[in-house]
Amino acid sequence: MDSNKITFFTRFEQDILAGRKTITIRDKSESSFQPNQILAVYTNETDRFFANIKVLSVTPIHFEALSEAHAQQENMTLPELRQVIKEIYPQEDCFWVIAFELVD
């Protein structure tokens, strides 16, 4: 994958564009993003570009340490967040929280 590209499931597009989703939680394979890096955002399903984001921080976290604050930044409840993470990464327990903001 292009090092300046990130994908999201289409269901998250509107939350990202509206500023309701300001973090993403990824596994080690996507932990190399750097603060201030500009990423082109595409849909996972169709590879359609829809935004640019700037990485604000990349912070390691264990699954059990996910909190209501993380869920709020994902625009979900904590049980929803934990369920989504386990659906996407069923074998993982260590993740990276990538905080971001939309850029023009």
UniProtKB/Swiss-Prot annotation:
Top-level taxon of origin: Bacteria
Family statement: Belongs to the N(4)-acetylcytidine amidohydrolase family.
This protein's name: N(4)-acetylcytidine amidohydrolase
Biological function: Catalyzes the hydrolysis of N(4)-acetylcytidine (ac4C).
GO MF annotation, one: hydrolase activity, acting on carbon-nitrogen (but not peptide) bonds, in linear amidines
Entries under Pfam families matching the protein: ASCH (PF04266)
Broad class of enzyme this protein falls into: hydrolase
Family annotation (Gene3D superfamilies): Hypothetical protein
GO CC terms in record: cytosol
Organism: Pasteurella multocida (strain Pm70)
Active-site feature positions: 21 (proton acceptor), 24 (nucleophile), 74 (proton donor)
Catalysed conversion reaction: N(4)-acetylcytidine + H2O = cytidine + acetate + H(+); N(4)-acetyl-2'-deoxycytidine + H2O = 2'-deoxycytidine + acetate + H(+); N(4)-acetylcytosine + H2O = cytosine + acetate + H(+)
HAMAP family linked to this entry: ac4C_amidohydr (MF_00684)
Keywords linked to the UniProt accession: Hydrolase
InterPro entries, sorted: AC4CH, ASCH_domain, PUA-like_sf
Domain ASCH: 7-104
EC number(s) on file: 3.5.1.135
